[in-house]
A protein has these predicted regions:
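Anion-binding and metal-coordination hotspots
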Residues: 1-3, 7, 66, 73-86, ...
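Secretory-pathway/luminal and periplasmic proteins that interact with or process carbohydrate-rich
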Residues: 90-95
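Basic, short loop/linker segments at the boundary and entry of helix-turn-helix/winged-helix-like folds
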Residues: 24-67, 72
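Residue-level signal for pocket-adjacent positions within structured domains
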Residues: 10-11, 15, 19, 35, ...
């Protein structure tokens, strides 16, 4: 008996109009995204209110298109445009319309307010469904590649060397021009073009050095409160007849480091360690605050290569929807400084905020011996003269501190893993700190909706 196969006929046209809803399962995430986006107030979208020009695509459709494509790993505007033709769920979402890549890109860069509103709306929806667990929040940062090559950068020292070389070359070209004019015969070089090229290059290098110098001053100003606090504490110890321990704190310097970098393609990005410090990439430091249910409750982007100054601004970025419920913030040793902890735990007037920081004061060994895994007694009481660092280390050794701090790695780090490995987001599509920040918000909204969809399905099945 001959093998039998299903007859495939790709040439016969459909005689009746097709219903796109029949092509997308009822439990598909695209339905959930459309329902969620419809709850965002329309006043947050940037649209042409005059009604002139061509008809606009509905802003809720455009936002749902971006979110669905980010959830499914398509971030470039051309890839998203292609999905409107090839992806059945996207065709359903767009009702068989096909926004071009220019419209998609323009909508993405013009709607920061809508992305911020979507972030709040999704958290409110999660709270309404009682899926958030906000009392304890973990804060961390991850490096996301910039849309720029590290080879398009120059260091502060190298820029100075190149400026000196350009000065010599300009002088040489001017001398050749004078000789050619005196001899009344043209030079072999196109001297005006060469002078213009070097003048433009000089201006770019001077701007690079000016930006690096401004960054150094800004960093020194940010480090000054921590330095002043350390100096005041050491002086208080001297006044009490005690010898301060440890080396003298180094005063913040406004002089740029010779290796400080400026990138010509994306000037606000920086060279940062990546891959567990194994290599360097042109990147941004994407920060997130994550609750115990693995929802991102606060997000921002930093241009700093490390997290030393990032705890206060990232804690301040926690959405007002959940901020009043936060009682504890967990961070690793990279975030710890006395000034950073004080900024989170105390208001400017000295009153307490009600938030307690649990921070490692040094890198912790994740391998535990059998003895360390067994229940441990409470640590002995601190000495009255204990430093802030000793107090924080003691806080983490208490039963409460241990129980809370072990949640850090299993909340915020898996979120970054899902964003990078499952969603595939490892590189920003936009350039400049402002645009990168709005794209990170869009990524976090997309992640939160994906997380909410998963938890909602699990709750339904239970």
């Amino acid at each position: 008996m001959a093998a039998r196969f299903v007859n495939l006929d790709r040439e016969t046209p459909m005689f009746l109009p097709y219903d796109l809803r029949e092509w997308v399962p009822a439990d598909h995430i695209v339905h959930f995204i459309l329902d969620a986006v419809e709850q965002i107030p329309t006043e947050h979208f940037s649209v042409n209110q005059r009604g002139t020009g061509s008809e606009q695509y509905p802003p809720t459709m455009m936002l749902a298109l971006l979110i669905y494509c980010y959830v499914t790993g398509r971030f470039g505007s051309r890839a998203i445009e292609a999905a409107t033709h090839s992806d059945v769920a996207v065709r359903y979402l767009c009702a068989n319309h096909h926004p071009d890549h220019a419209s998609i890109c323009a909508f993405r860069t013009a709607n920061k307010a809508a992305f911020d509103a979507a972030f709040v709306t999704v958290l409110q929806l999660a709270q309404h469904l009682k899926l958030t667990k906000v009392g304890t929040v973990s804060v961390d940062g991850t490096k996301i590649q910039a849309n720029a090559s590290k080879h398009a950068a120059v260091s502060y020292a190298r820029a100075g060397e190149m400026l000196a070389q350009l000065e010599l070359e300009v002088k040489e070209l001017m001398e050749r021009a004078q000789q050619a004019e005196a001899q009344e015969r043209p030079d072999a070089l196109d001297i005006p073009a060469e002078l213009t090229r070097r003048t433009d290059r000089k201006a770019a290098l001077q701007q690079a050095r000016a930006v690096i110098e401004a960054r150094a001053k800004e960093l020194a100003a940010a480090q000054q409160p921590d330095y002043a606090a350390k100096q005041a504490k050491r002086q208080a110890q001297r006044d009490a007849g005690q010898k301060p321990r440890g080396p003298e704190p180094k005063a913040p310097s406004e002089t740029p480091a010779p290796k400080a970098q400026y990138n010509f393609t994306d000037p606000t990005s920086g060279i940062m360690k990546a891959g567990s410090g194994q290599h360097f990439e042109q990147s941004y430091n994407a920060q997130a605050a994550v609750d115990a249910a693995m929802f991102i409750v606060g997000a921002r982007v930093s241009v700093a290569a490390n997290d030393k100054q990032e705890l206060p601004p990232t804690a301040a970025a926690i959405s007002p929807v959940v901020a009043p419920q936060v009682t504890a913030i967990l961070v690793d040793s990279g975030f710890y400084s006395e000034a950073a902890v004080q900024a989170v735990e105390q208001n400017p007037d000295g009153t307490v905020t009600g938030v307690t920081v649990f921070a490692a004061v040094e890198k912790m060994d994740h391998h535990k011996t059998v003895a360390e895994l067994l229940p441990q007694p409470e640590p002995p009481a601190l000495a009255p003269a204990a430093t802030a660092k000793e107090k924080m280390a003691h806080r983490l050794k208490t039963a409460v501190g241990k129980e809370l701090y072990k949640l850090r790695k299993q909340t915020v780090e898996p979120v970054f893993g899902i964003i990078k490995e499952v969603m595939g987001f490892r590189r920003f599509s936009l350039r400049g700190h402002a645009k990168v920040s709005l794209e990170w918000t869009l990524v976090c909204v997309s992640y939160n909706l994906k997380r909410l969809f998963s938890l909602k399905n699990l709750a339904t099945m239970a």
